[in-house]
Amino acid sequence: MTSGRTGILGGSFDPIHYGHLAIAEEVRVLLRLNRVLIIPAREQPLKPGGSVASPAHRLAMARLACADNPFFEVSRIEIDRPDPSYTSVTLQLLHEQGLNDLYLILGIDSVADLPRWREVRRILELAHIVGVARPGAAVDLSHLSQVLPQLPARLIEIDGPRLDISSTDLRQRVAQGRPIRYQTPDAVVAYIEANGLYR
């Protein structure tokens, strides 16, 4: 894996959709990143209930969604690990692979939740935090500097594209027989249909 300014966008991606992709591209362009790693989580520690689709299905959908963007790379780094997908571990592994200029892309609501994350101080040592505004997420971050004094120097706030699309809604729409086209790439729609996901 070549070095350079690298964005990290992790998540369940259950399924991946245009909201994820638009944020990744916005951050890539604004911060002049060499690439963005899309990292599907095997299991998100702070998301109870887990994912609906299997890790293999979510990885496949992410690959299909990113296939036409040469700056996006889908990584198996968390899918292949048996343990929960702790960001601190992932960033450390990427650092050991020579990626030393990392930009962790989070919704601004997730930035507010950082004090609950495992080894958050190590995360801040290993990566810049890119907080992206999302629809319906009016978040006050002023209290965070008291809990995480190093955060202000590592935080980049971006007013990202506000596409009000959620994976939860897409799963519900599929279950109800409603269309999801134009909310996620056609290849992902076809994959969901072909594999009977979310029914």
UniProtKB/Swiss-Prot annotation:
The keyword Plastid does not apply. Its EC number is 2.7.7.18. The keyword Phosphoprotein does not apply. It catalyses: nicotinate beta-D-ribonucleotide + ATP + H(+) = deamido-NAD(+) + diphosphate. GO terms for biological process: NAD biosynthetic process. Keywords: ATP-binding, NAD, Nucleotide-binding, Nucleotidyltransferase, Pyridine nucleotide biosynthesis, Transferase. GO terms for molecular function: ATP binding; nicotinate-nucleotide adenylyltransferase activity. InterPro entries: Cyt_trans-like, NadD/NMNAT, Rossmann-like_a/b/a_fold. It holds the Pfam family CTP_transf_like. It comes from the Bacteria. Pathway: Cofactor biosynthesis; NAD(+) biosynthesis; deamido-NAD(+) from nicotinate D-ribonucleotide: step 1/1. Belongs to the NadD family. NCBIfam families: cyt_tran_rel (TIGR00125), nicotinate (nicotinamide) nucleotide adenylyltransferase (TIGR00482), PRK00071.1-3 (NF000840). Catalyzes the reversible adenylation of nicotinate mononucleotide (NaMN) to nicotinic acid adenine dinucleotide (NaAD). This is Probable nicotinate-nucleotide adenylyltransferase. It comes from Roseiflexus castenholzii (strain DSM 13941 / HLO8).
